[in-house]
């Protein structure tokens, strides 16, 4: 599970970019809840500190909006942009969305698609401008509000991000991803109790939401309640058994409660599942060191 919420972080990840598509497909994410584009790389931790993986901000809805406008040529270029997003050619996708907007400046879907694609490549200022352009056309669009919140959070404007997520929740109180996103942002402001409340709400609304349980586990660890955190990590792991980051955090939580054999087992699974990339090297090294410690005779 990547560190961060849009999509994925979140959500984000999206490093990994999760692009949720209204077409019903889910291509790989390049942000999220690892460090997402536009985020600073995590600072080194003391050798005896358990690594903590940051939450992922997710998108409220699908990352690419189906065109609803009638201009056939603008729609064609928007569709091409969506196709290039699927292909992973974000530069060409951006060109197509811009072409659509040259043909039809008030094309809401193209503004929103362009905004999210710019955010995926780390062009936060340009992305925010496009989100705001989309909202001028459709001020009540909740997806645009949520995704603007994600962009603002990644830019460090936590207050602005919270305002956007709360706008979503005023109109749609049952939005699980908006609760997760708000929780992540509140945690970033130091409001751990507020974050816990949002994660618990998300988990109660959607018991099978992996990010809600994972984020709740992380917050409970920070709150000093490892037993409850372990329960949340186990729930998340049941939903996604091959998620390396869940196993890493579960292993560290188990080690912290003296469950050495179980902790070692989870860390071995993490090392088996995690990709050996520069972004993951820090976590891999710390997991290897912790596993050696756990395997030493008492």
Protein language model regions, located:
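Ankyrin-repeat and related helical/solenoid repeat scaffolds used for protein-protein interactions
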Residues: 214-276
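Conserved alpha-helical positions within TPR/SEL1-like repeat arrays
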Residues: 75-86, 109-120, 143-154, 177-188, ...
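Structural signature of tandem alpha-helical TPR/SEL1-like repeats
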Residues: 54-59, 87-99, 109, 120-133, ...
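Terminal, low-structured helical/coil segments at or just beyond the last alpha-helical repeat
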Residues: 36-65, 256, 260-298
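Long, contiguous interaction/recruitment modules in multidomain scaffold/adaptor proteins
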Residues: 2-5, 11-70
């Amino acid at each position: 599970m990547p560190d961060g919420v849009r999509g994925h972080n979140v959500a984000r990840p999206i490093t990994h970019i999760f692009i949720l598509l209204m077409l019903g497909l889910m291509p790989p994410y390049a942000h999220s809840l690892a460090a997402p584009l536009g985020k600073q790389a995590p600072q080194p931790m003391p050798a005896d500190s358990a690594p903590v993986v940051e939450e992922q901000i997710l998108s409220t809805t699908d990352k690419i909006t189906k065109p609803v406008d009638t201009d056939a040529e603008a729609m064609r270029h928007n569709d091409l942009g969506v196709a290039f997003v699927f292909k992973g050619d974000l530069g060409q996708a951006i060109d197509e969305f811009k072409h659509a907007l040259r043909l039809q400046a008030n094309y809401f879907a193209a503004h929103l698609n362009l905004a999210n694609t710019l955010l995926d490549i780390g062009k936060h200022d340009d992305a925010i401008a496009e989100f705001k352009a989309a909202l001028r056309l459709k001020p009540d669009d909740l997806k645009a509000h949520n995704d603007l919140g994600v962009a603002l959070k990644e830019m460090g404007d936590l207050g602005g991000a919270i305002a956007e997520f709360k706008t979503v929740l005023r109109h749609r109180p049952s939005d699980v991803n908006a609760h997760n996103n708000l929780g992540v942002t509140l945690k970033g402001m130091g409001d751990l109790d507020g974050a816990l409340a949002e994660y618990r709400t998300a988990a109660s609304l959607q018991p099978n939401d992996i990010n809600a349980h994972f984020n709740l586990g992380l917050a409970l660890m920070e709150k000093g309640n490892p037993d409850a955190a372990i329960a949340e990590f186990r729930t998340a792991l049941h939903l996604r058994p091959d998620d390396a980051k869940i196993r890493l955090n579960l292993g560290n939580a188990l080690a912290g409660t003296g469950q050495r054999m179980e902790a070692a087992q989870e860390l071995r699974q993490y090392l088996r599942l995690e990709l050996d990339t520069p972004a993951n090297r820090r976590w891999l090294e710390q997991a290897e060191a912790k596993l050696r410690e756990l395997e030493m005779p008492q």
